[in-house]
């Protein structure tokens, strides 16, 4: 039995020129994709079963890290508690994913000082925003 894995799927833009991001939780028992869909001010949370590679719009999947089996429930709770911000004009699916990752740091699911995670987070922060 392998450890659960978190990754971020980066997809072709759905709206405008912003790449779409979603969080992927892979376990031995299920694959869940957490994302927001829509545009300001009508974003909605969506959870689906499947892998990022199930769609042709996937550009790449960034490995965030392995997590402990007890952390599966914590990640699911963090996602459930994550808020959709339909008030802030600049908020989007990329912010949603970054906010969940930061909440996972606060819950000690992810370690901010882990060099691999820090590198992925830096890549995501660099990719944040419109495609140029």
Predicted segments, located by residue:
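Active-site nucleophile-His-acid catalytic modules used for acyl/amide transfer and hydrolysis
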Residues: 56-132
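Short secondary-structure capping micro-motifs at structural edges
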Residues: 9-11, 20-21, 45-50, 82-83
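Compact, well-ordered interaction domains used in eukaryotic information-processing assemblies
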Residues: 27-56, 63-66
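N-terminal accessory segments that precede or flank the first globular/catalytic domain
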Residues: 1-40
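Generic alpha-helical secondary structure signal
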Residues: 15, 38, 47, 97-100, ...
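Short low-complexity stretches enriched in small and charged residues
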Residues: 14-19, 51-56, 128
């Amino acid at each position: 039995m392998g450890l659960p894995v978190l990754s971020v799927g980066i997809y072709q833009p759905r709206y405008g020129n912003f790449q779409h991001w979603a969080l992927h939780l892979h376990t031995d028992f299920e694959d869940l994709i957490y994302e927001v869909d829509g545009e300001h001010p009508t974003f909605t949370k969506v959870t689906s079963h499947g892998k990022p590679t199930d769609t042709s719009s996937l550009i790449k999947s960034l490995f965030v890290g392995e997590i402990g089996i007890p952390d599966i429930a914590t990640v699911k709770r963090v996602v459930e508690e994550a808020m959709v911000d339909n008030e802030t004009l600049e908020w989007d699916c990329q912010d949603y994913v970054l906010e969940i990752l930061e909440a996972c740091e606060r819950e000690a699911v992810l370690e901010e000082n882990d060099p691999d995670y820090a590198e992925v987070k830096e890549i995501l922060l660099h990719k944040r925003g419109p495609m140029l």
